[in-house]
A protein has these predicted regions:
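Amphipathic alpha-helical segments
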Residues: 26-27, 40-120
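General helical structural elements
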Residues: 6-7, 41, 77, 132
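Bacterial Sec-dependent N-terminal signal peptides
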Residues: 1-25
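A short hydrophobic/aromatic micro-motif that marks alpha-helical segments and, especially, helix-coil
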Residues: 17-18, 63-66, 137-140
Length: 154
């Protein structure tokens, strides 16, 4: 897992250097992450040959939806990066509502796809999928939070 954390750290090292990211840059960033991630999933989840095709169909569907949530998160983080120095109490409340809702959306997505993976493979494969996704999200959140400056009280 240390190798995995290192990969994640490398992918997210420049997150707060985005100044005015456009959709193409976000898509490129996510496609790079998606390629690395699929190799990681293949290594750790290891669906059996009999279920492999069904697993990857469900996984690809999950990734499509996860990327949408990822884009929303990147946009929110860009907003934070440009506003944190002058953020008001009201703006912080609004930003927190959005990020909490996004975290909930992401967590529900994983649970939903855990159930789908369990139906097309085995409970063990589904559990590994859930463990890996939770690990990756936790590691990514850690890397992001580690780079985020604290908002000053005005």
């Amino acid at each position: 897992m240390k190798k995995l954390t290192f990969i994640i750290a490398g992918l997210f090292a420049g997150l707060f250097t985005f100044a005015q990211s456009n959709t193409e840059e976000i898509d490129l960033f996510q496609s790079m992450y998606g390629i690395e991630k699929k190799a990681i999933v293949k290594e750790f989840v290891q669906p059996k040959a009999i279920n492999r095709e069904a697993f990857w169909e469900v996984y690809d569907s999950y990734e499509t939806k996860r990327k949408v949530v990822g884009k929303e998160r990147i946009i929110l983080l860009e907003q934070f990066a440009t506003q944190y120095e002058k953020m008001t109490n009201d703006e912080s409340i609004l930003w927190m509502k959005k990020i909490i809702a996004l975290d909930d959306k992401q967590d529900k997505l994983i649970v939903s796809y855990y159930k789908k993976v369990s139906k097309v493979t085995t409970p063990i494969v589904a559990m590994r999928f859930y463990q890996l996704e939770t690990y990756l999200i936790t590691a990514i959140r850690y890397e992001i939070l580690n780079e985020m400056p604290f908002v000053e009280d005005k």
